[in-house]
């Protein structure tokens, strides 16, 4: 057993040979390397599978033994300072390693088909291999310097993968935005690490925890300074895990290939921030103000992410805001001190969200044959619909992932989210109300995505759509850039959304709705049926087995992974697999809890949370189910006519919610106006001072000297005797002036 742990340090480096060899091969032997592309893919999957098996073995052993910490290499700078390189194996490391490798393997298998026609196929796999290596190095790190090194590598890999299609200006801007935003967080993290070293004199996790506990017990620490260091440490996870207000990079990161979106949102980039907060929780937990800040940032992100997802038309962007909201739940749990619930939700959400992203990639892949390869078309849910009969396997998998994220039992996210909601009730009633309300919003926007994508008919053939930019209704009045130029900002949302080519009418009109097969009215969209012509229509088809296989495996994970946190026996609440791994786990909310499971309380709380989820699903179903398929929706809409007195108020509310969501809460606009433009203005002023004033003074002295020399040259008549005469005259005058000044002092 000890022999096995001695080689744990090699975990991050097992997948590393493939990206290194690919990089060298593409530079020196590009043709031969490209001809062996399938072999490189197999090697990537094989090496990551070895890491997965190793991680599984370590996880099993973690149930029976304590944490393992060992330094492998040391760089001594002087007698008082040295850098250590080692590994720290504990249940958190084991769980994260399994999560990274399982999702990573499935994404690699998926990418083999998804990226097969891309010219950057091998470059993509090189980046992916390096990404997995960086994340594995991060979770096995034994000290903060090592963490920061791999933390930066994770950010670099995300920059490369988000901007993988760097020839597209949108993708290039997206990767720059992600890079710059994370620089802010990384700078704060670096300052926090240096401040913590100033206090404790060590970077090692175990030494940090022990030294700091002693300082606290002896009251030998400046509490304000440590609070500042703790906050700076938390700034890094705020940016990396897309927490408010440094979340702005996450939706733009969807410009990268779909497989990398799945990996970033499930097991790598955004999970890194949650991991670091969990790793440093023994430090944060002794500072109530930092714990409250963590929970506050988490609850704000929970609500903000859910509201921003309400009006997205891009399927990947909607899922991105969903990730942001779910990460907020995890951060909220960590801020409440519910360590186990946060990590449980990290696990269940990772597999559910990977399933949803790979499912969306399958949909996008099938839609590209119909609408083309532009993401503005292939990812646009407005052009989808009616895919149930065309992609039944993908539809079933996507539905399971959607239900899981909504918190429907017995799927994975139900168990973890229910724990967080229950803990929020113990922590703060206000936080509990927000968390529970957001659970309903989650169900609403997730089923909105599902219904727009799979229900009804294929909207591509029902839209007045052309591949060229036009002023047709395909701009949908609220979606296209072209329409934004001519949009009257005073328009109400509801009248605008239900307008057709000849007139504009309100969603809540005075006369009863009539059955019409030519118009489908939905909140936020209107789709016109212009009739079928004689041309042949093509429809999406199910993806290949290489794409479906990872989706089906993730489907199984989504169905059964929640079992690791369920106490199946009656011995106590800490007798499930997850609790055995995290024993003794940090949980401030259940220190005095009973040693048995109160199933009545569990069922009561579960019924409440599931009821909220079903209410959100019901609202989404009423608003987004195809109207022409049933008369029930018309009856529902006609009942709204009785609300004439509330019509204007209701329209204003919908208009506000839509504008808030579609414009990203105006946060991007705020940053652009008051931060980016201010920095650019300051840069312009600095440039003016540097070139006009600083350079002007220097150049002025030089020009003045030049003209004085020119004048002197003509006065001397180009004779040495004249130059000597003038020189001696000037020296004499200078000495006389100096003498008189000196004489006056006496």
Curated annotation (Swiss-Prot):
A GO cellular component entry from the record: chloroplast thylakoid membrane
EC number(s) on file: 7.1.1.-
Superkingdom of source: Eukaryota
Location in the cell: Plastid, Chloroplast thylakoid membrane
GO BP, sorted A to Z: ATP synthesis coupled electron transport; electron transport coupled proton transport
Catalytic activity: a plastoquinone + NADH + (n+1) H(+)(in) = a plastoquinol + NAD(+) + n H(+)(out); a plastoquinone + NADPH + (n+1) H(+)(in) = a plastoquinol + NADP(+) + n H(+)(out)
InterPro entries registered for this protein in UniProt: NADH_UbQ_OxRdtase_chlpt_su5_C, NADHpl_OxRdtase_5_subgr, ND/Mrp_TM, NU5C-like, Proton_antipo_N
Gene3D superfamilies with a match to the protein in the record: 1.20.5.2700
Bilayer-crossing regions: 9-29, 39-59, 89-109, 125-145, 147-167, 185-205, 221-241, 258-278, 280-300, 327-347, 354-374, 396-416, 425-445, 547-567, 608-628, 723-743
Membrane topology, record value: Multi-pass membrane protein
Catalytic class of the enzyme: translocase
NCBIfam families: NDH_I_L, PRK06590.1
Function field: NDH shuttles electrons from NAD(P)H:plastoquinone, via FMN and iron-sulfur (Fe-S) centers, to quinones in the photosynthetic chain and possibly in a chloroplast respiratory chain. The immediate electron acceptor for the enzyme in this species is believed to be plastoquinone. Couples the redox reaction to proton translocation, and thus conserves the redox energy in a proton gradient.
Record-stated family: Belongs to the complex I subunit 5 family.
Protein name stated in the entry: NAD(P)H-quinone oxidoreductase subunit 5, chloroplastic
Species the sequence originates in: Capsella bursa-pastoris (Shepherd's purse)
Lineage start: Eukaryota, Viridiplantae, Streptophyta, Embryophyta, Tracheophyta
Protein encoded by which gene: ndhF
């Amino acid at each position: 057993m000890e022999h096995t742990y001695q080689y744990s340090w090699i975990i991050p480096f097992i997948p590393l040979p493939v990206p290194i060899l690919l990089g060298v091969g593409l530079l020196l032997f590009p043709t031969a390397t490209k001809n062996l592309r399938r072999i490189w893919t197999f090697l990537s999957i094989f090496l990551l599978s070895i890491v997965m098996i190793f991680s599984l073995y370590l996880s099993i052993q973690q149930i029976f033994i304590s944490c393992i910490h060992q330094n492998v290499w040391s760089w001594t700078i002087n007698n008082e300072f040295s850098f250590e390189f080692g590994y720290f194996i504990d249940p958190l490391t084991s769980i994260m390693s399994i999560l990274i490798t399982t999702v990573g393997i499935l994404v690699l298998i998926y990418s083999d088909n998804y990226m097969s026609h891309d010219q950057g196929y091998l470059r993509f796999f090189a980046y992916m291999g390096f990404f997995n290596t960086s994340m594995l190095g991060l979770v096995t790190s034994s000290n903060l310097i090592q963490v920061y090194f791999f933390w930066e590598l994770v950010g670099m890999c995300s920059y490369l993968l988000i901007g993988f299609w760097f020839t597209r200006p949108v993708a290039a801007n997206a990767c720059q935005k992600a890079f710059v935003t994370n620089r802010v967080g990384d700078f704060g993290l670096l300052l926090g690490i240096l401040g913590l070293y100033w206090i404790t004199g060590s970077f090692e996790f175990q030494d940090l925890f022990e030294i700091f506990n002693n300082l606290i017990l002896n009251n030998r620490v400046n509490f304000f300074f440590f609070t500042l260091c703790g906050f700076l440490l938390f700034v890094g996870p705020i940016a990396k895990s897309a927490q408010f207000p440094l979340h702005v990079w996450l939706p733009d990161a969807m410009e990268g290939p779909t497989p990398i979106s799945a990996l970033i949102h499930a097991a790598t980039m955004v999970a890194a921030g949650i991991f670091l907060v969990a790793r440093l929780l023994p430090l944060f937990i002794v500072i109530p103000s930092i714990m409250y800040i963590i929970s506050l940032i988490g609850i704000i992100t929970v609500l903000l992410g859910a509201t921003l997802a309400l009006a997205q038309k891009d399927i990947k962007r909607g899922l991105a805001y969903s990730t942001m909201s779910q990460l907020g739940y995890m951060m909220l749990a960590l801020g409440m001190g519910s360590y186990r619930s946060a990590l449980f939700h990290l696990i269940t959400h990772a597999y559910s969200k990977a399933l949803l992203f790979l499912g969306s990639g399958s949909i996008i892949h099938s839609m590209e044959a119909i609408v083309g390869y532009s993401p503005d078309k292939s990812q646009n849910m407005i052009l989808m619909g009616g895919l149930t009969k065309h992609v039944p396997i993908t539809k079933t998998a996507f539905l399971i992932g959607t239900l899981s994220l909504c918190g429907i039992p017995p799927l994975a996210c139900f168990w973890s989210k229910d724990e967080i909601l229950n803990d929020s009730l113990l922590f703060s009633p206000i936080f509990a109300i927000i968390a529970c309300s957001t659970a309903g919003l989650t169900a609403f926007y997730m089923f909105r995505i599902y219904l727009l994508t799979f229900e009804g008919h294929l909207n591509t053939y029902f839209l007045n759509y052309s591949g060229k930019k036009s002023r047709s209704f395909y701009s949908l009045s609220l979606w296209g850039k072209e329409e934004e130029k001519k949009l009257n900002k005073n328009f109400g949302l509801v009248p605008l959304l239900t307008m057709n080519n000849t007139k504009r009418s309100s969603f809540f009109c005075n006369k009863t709705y009539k059955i019409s097969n030519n118009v489908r009215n939905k909140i936020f969209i209107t789709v016109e049926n212009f009739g079928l012509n004689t041309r042949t229509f093509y429809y999406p088809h199910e993806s290949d087995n290489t794409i479906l296989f990872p989706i089906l495996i993730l489907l199984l994970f989504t169905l059964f992974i929640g079992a690791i946190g369920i106490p199946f026996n009656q011995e106590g609440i800490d007798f499930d697999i997850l609790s055995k791994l995290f024993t003794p786990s940090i949980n401030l909310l259940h220190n005095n809890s009973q040693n048995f499971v109160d199933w009545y309380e569990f069922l009561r709380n579960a019924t409440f949370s599931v009821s909220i989820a079903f209410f959100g699903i019901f609202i989404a179903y009423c608003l987004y189910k195809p109207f022409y398929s049933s008369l029930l929706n018309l009856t529902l809409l006609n009942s709204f006519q009785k609300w004439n007195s509330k019509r204007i108020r209701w329209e204003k509310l919908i208009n506000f919610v839509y504008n808030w969501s579609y414009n990203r809460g105006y946060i991007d606009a705020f940053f652009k106006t008051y931060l980016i433009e201010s920095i650019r203005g300051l840069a312009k002023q600095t440039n003016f001072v540097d070139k006009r004033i600083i350079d002007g003074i220097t150049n002025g002295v030089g020009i003045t000297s030049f003209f004085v020399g020119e004048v002197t040259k003509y006065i001397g008549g180009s004779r040495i005797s004249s130059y000597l005469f003038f020189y001696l005259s000037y020296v004499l005058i200078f000495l006389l002036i100096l003498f008189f000044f000196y004489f006056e002092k006496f």
